[in-house]
Amino acid sequence: FECDVWAIEEGSVIFPHEPIVTVRGPLYQVQMIETMLLLILNHQSLVATKTSRMVRVAKGRAISEFGSRRAHGADAANLGARAAYIGGAAASANTYTDRHLGIPATGTMAHSWVQSFDGELESFRAYAEVYPSACLLLVDTYDVLRSGIPNAIKVFNELNEKGYRPLGIRIDSGDIAYLTKETRKMLDAAGFEDAKIVVSNSMDEFKIRDLLNQGAKIDSFGVGERLITAKSDPVFGGVYKLVAMEEDGKIIPKIKVSEDVVKITTPGFKQIYRIYNKDTGFMEADLVCLHD
């Protein structure tokens, strides 16, 4: 492989119409890597961008990636979890990425755990026995406010007597805004002001923003299918285009023209300079110019 490759540092903010990766070398070699390069960049940039949007609207509340079961295959699940972490997710329910990539693993009990016992309280006690220092209970299998939270509080009191503080509860269905407000009141009244409320169920940046605008009492979000598939906009339109040829040591710009304006390429071997405010340290603009 005789090509030179320049790339924006992974995890950096990048804007439309800017080169993310530039490859310079023999034309046949440059062309051979097109499909794989676009496959990697488009998929993972898509998921990282979607995650970043959710992280921003969550306003400091953790976003955890829960999407493997709805991903478009094993590679999409694993690489999507990686991209989500780069995009700002705090953790992933994908244990492969924990073991092989060092991404923190997270997760809670399943509804099937609760259903496999004769009663909800029994299932909570069994879970607390296994995870006394990391007890986070799923409370919506039957009835959140009449059953789930009262039973969780009973188990939390039992843990407290043994010297453990519970992590909290998770709600995966129902009127999330209303249920979290009532849950917060019940937990606080029982002396568990530090217990966290985690929610899931088809979350994305739009639903997260709506819940927070309603005053929902949420500490973190588990986000699945709408993150791992970027459901609202599932295609990242990155392209790989010839922009220059070198002839006798001279760079000759090349352009693709079209009646469709968005299909017209920007010619030339380019370089990006990012401009920061010297007083605030904030990014202010990008300058795209010719490499020389």
Q: What do these predicted regions represent?
A:
Residues 188-190, 195, 203-292:
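Gly/Ser/Thr/Ala-enriched C-terminal appendages of enzymes
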